[in-house]
Regions:
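Conserved, carboxylate-rich catalytic/transport cores that coordinate ions
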Residues: 1-297
């Protein structure tokens, strides 16, 4: 869970400059408050800042400025930006960063489904998890096969027969053998209901990962807005005052944006972990029932 949380946090921040600030804050606070018992927290902030820095370079944003269009950025740095890898920064008409967020979400959910399948098999046995195996085989296997087909690793003929075999095996597991020993017609009805819940649930879960792109985009646009406001102040024909107000606006704006971005980058990855991931991994929470009102003698 840790690597995915760091990646999600960094994508929500989406700015290499903010990553540097977080690392500097973590380093300063760790040196300043060595005996406070918060060393692990500052180390975590440092790791999150480091991931934010590298992901921010990959996404092409530095303190709200686009690295691709910046005159000060060297060519090797621009080559790291994913938007420059595709024409107009889009894949099939969609922003490449949005596609990246959805792809990472699919990977996250597939990992959860594999863990669910293995754990349920250990707990309940294979005979009671046939349907779970069918869905995992269909979704995870389908994604792998389609990816190999798109990369032309599989020929068109092989791709067709592998998809047919995958669909046939998964269909039998989901609709016919989902509960061995039960009436096949009941199994088919149960499989149809399970299919409805699975399709609608997975669609919502995958689309939920678009928030990684949306939060990063919002933070970048807000940072750019403060940059524009600061440069507009420089047009005031008062040599010293304009620079003072420009610096104040830039510092205030980016501090505010950093604080709001950190809040969103902390909350939303937690939601993706506790809702989308735990649900698809079959995690069942434990705990004591809350019962504050009791009779005492």
């Amino acid at each position: 869970l840790g690597p995915f949380f760091m990646l999600f946090f960094a994508m929500c921040m989406g700015d290499a400059g903010y990553g540097i600030v977080l690392m500097l804050i973590a380093l300063y606070m760790k040196q300043k408050m060595q005996d406070s018992g918060l060393g692990k927290m500052y180390r975590l902030i440092g790791f999150l800042g480091g991931m934010t820095f590298f992901v921010g370079l990959f996404l092409g944003t530095f303190f709200g400025m686009s690295i691709l269009s910046a005159s000060w950025a060297p060519s090797w740095l621009k080559a790291l930006c994913i938007d420059g890898w595709f024409p107009d920064g889009k894949i099939a008409g969609f922003p490449v960063q949005m596609v990246l967020a959805v792809a990472i979400g699919v990977l996250h959910i597939c990992l959860a489904m594999i863990i669910k399948t293995v754990n349920f098999t250990k707990r309940f046995g294979f005979s009671k998890t046939v349907s779970t195996w069918g869905w995992t085989t269909l979704i995870v296997g389908g994604i792998v096969v389609i990816s190999l087909g798109m990369m032309e690793v599989l020929s068109a003929e092989v791709f067709k027969w592998v998809i047919i075999a995958l669909a046939a095996v998964s269909g039998l597991a989901i609709f016919v053998f989902n509960t061995p020993g039960r009436n096949p017609l009941v199994n088919i009805g149960s499989g149809l209901w399970d299919t409805y819940n699975m399709v609608t649930g997975l669609l919502g879960d995958v689309l939920s990962y678009i928030r990684l792109y949306a939060l990063g985009l919002a933070g970048g646009m807000l940072g750019n807005a403060f940059n524009i406001m600061g440069t507009m102040i420089l047009d005031i024909p008062v040599p010293v005052v304009n620079w003072v107000f420009c610096i104040v606006i830039l510092i205030f704006g980016h501090v505010l944006n950093l604080a709001m971005s950190c809040l969103g980058a902390f909350v939303h990855p937690l939601r993706l972990t506790f809702v989308e991931y735990f649900k698809n991994s079959g995690y069942e929470g434990t705990g004591a029932k809350y019962n504050p009102l009791v009779k005492t003698k």
